[in-house]
């Protein structure tokens, strides 16, 4: 019986393990503490259930596991509600009739924030996925606007066609790079442009009403209205767009926590009246959700604030890095708590990072995190500390430069690398000017007739240059003389004309007197 009881307990444990993934993962992610700990032993846990940018962190390549964790910052899901709202976005189901700018302005008024932006304009009659970024998340708007989009639309054909297969073939033909001109009523200049259609297919066709439902995956800035007109031209019957809905923008689609304007209004009302922020946290998502498709680079806590101030992303500050990083690829730099620090352009591949121990890993493209979220950890070395003490005592000026009180030993020992780099930069143009210019090559006809003369020394200019200079001087002198002569002639002409006028006046007076 004892053996039977033992086997039943084991079975229960197995059932419990199996039931873990079926639990509400979102609640666990909000309640538990998630952090990459500074230890050499990797914990045996299921990191596929970790939230946002920390998902599967144990599968990243490890450069080092040792760093000093700082209490600053917080997991994106555990931020205070004010910070959570200011660094979030809403996957909004845009209603028909209001424009995208009106919708964004309404959300700004509802949430009482200063700044909002959206992921790409939708026409007033178009519904569907509109990503509304709030305050700090507006730094990601540019990258979201250029991301690919997916649409489901209804096209109305002006005349009947032979079969549904004909329409399906025509829709699939309109793929690849296509010429497009914006519609007659458009907010932009009607210039011819090229846009790429990645994939398109017919979903359904009603031959009685001549309506076809189609799905399109396309580049940002594609006009589906123009695509429907082209479809009608291709079939030879004419066509126009009847309805349109955006089902995906970037990496977020209809099924990814899409909310309505009423949900946003209710969530804010619930927080204002009942101090319940759970609805706001459900409606607004952290900005890190938009970056889950990027390759990751995990930085030490001590390097975070330096990057926020624009420092280079150097290899000694890197803890972990992802497989498959390529040159000039856009990556996301994150903290050990899973917060996005910045977007960057990779200057090293994964292979180079694994073999090097120094150098610049990536170039900052856009800083996302606010400055001084983490403490400053630069200027804490012995020389920097000594310099701060000397500034306090008045031995150096407020900029750290020598003054009358500065001891001679400091002037001799201390090397200001900023000034030395400026001097080197100033020397470069002088060195370029001092480089000897190569003598001009003669034409082939001249070189054949004349003997080759040795090149003149750089101290004395060649006779050709002297003769050119003399010619220029002579020309200038001639022009000056001509100008002077012309001036004298003009004066003489003016004087002659004035004398003639006086004579005429005298004659007129004499005539008048004689007549009287």
Curated annotation (Swiss-Prot):
Residues 434-446 have a biased composition (Basic and acidic residues). Residues 463-516 form a coiled coil. Residues 294-369 form the PUA domain. CDD domains: PseudoU_synth_hDyskerin (cd02572), PUA_Cbf5 (cd21148). Keywords: Coiled coil, Isomerase, Nucleus, Ribonucleoprotein, Ribosome biogenesis, RNA-binding, rRNA processing. It comes from the Eukaryota. Residues 469-478 have a biased composition (Basic residues). This is H/ACA ribonucleoprotein complex subunit DKC1. It comes from Gallus gallus. The gene is DKC1.
